[in-house]
Amino acid sequence: MYFTLLVVVILTAIALVAVALGIARAISPRSYNSQKGEAYECGIPTRGRSWMQFKVGYYLFAILFLMFDVETVFLFPWAVVVQDLGVYGLFSILFFLVILVLGLAYAWKKGALEWK
């Protein structure tokens, strides 16, 4: 019973998105010129090649930042209700922090925190 309802809702959502995209494509104005394909940054014309390679280090630092940012998102609510959770809550957050510290130690050992 609920599976049928789920399928109907998903198909309806897909159909509505397809109709909206189709209508937008049908009624949108089309103008092709040389400036439309140019890349820009903050309204300033590009100098040199527009496709540049970035070092992987930026992405690695971004992923590590996100990992520890998510840790903070989990720690703040835990700190608010720490007294109500008891021993189980303490051990669960300690387990979480141990896994996080092990991940940090692994990244440090592999040299992910060193800028090359």
Swiss-Prot record:
KW Transmembrane (keyword) present: yes
Alphabetically, the GO molecular function entries are: NADH dehydrogenase (ubiquinone) activity; NADH:ubiquinone reductase (non-electrogenic) activity; quinone binding
Signal peptide residues are: none
Q: Where is this protein chiefly located?
A: membrane
Membrane topology qualifier: Multi-pass membrane protein
Instruction: List, alphabetically, the Pfam families matched.
Output: Oxidored_q4
Show the stretches that span the lipid bilayer.
3-23, 61-81, 85-105
The reaction(s) this protein catalyses: a quinone + NADH + 5 H(+)(in) = a quinol + NAD(+) + 4 H(+)(out)
Which segments does the entry list as coiled coil?
none
InterPro entries in alphabetical order:
NAD(P)H_OxRDtase_bac/plastid, NADH_UbQ/plastoQ_OxRdtase_su3, NDAH_ubi_oxred_su3_sf
Q: What does the sequence similarity comment in the record state about its family?
A: Belongs to the complex I subunit 3 family.
Subunit and partners: NDH-1 is composed of 14 different subunits. Subunits NuoA, H, J, K, L, M, N constitute the membrane sector of the complex.
What does the function comment of this entry state? Answer: NDH-1 shuttles electrons from NADH, via FMN and iron-sulfur (Fe-S) centers, to quinones in the respiratory chain. The immediate electron acceptor for the enzyme in this species is believed to be a menaquinone. Couples the redox reaction to proton translocation (for every two electrons transferred, four hydrogen ions are translocated across the cytoplasmic membrane), and thus conserves the redox energy in a proton gradient.
Protein name stated in the entry: NADH-quinone oxidoreductase subunit A
Source organism of the structure = Phocaeicola vulgatus (strain ATCC 8482 / DSM 1447 / JCM 5826 / CCUG 4940 / NBRC 14291 / NCTC 11154)
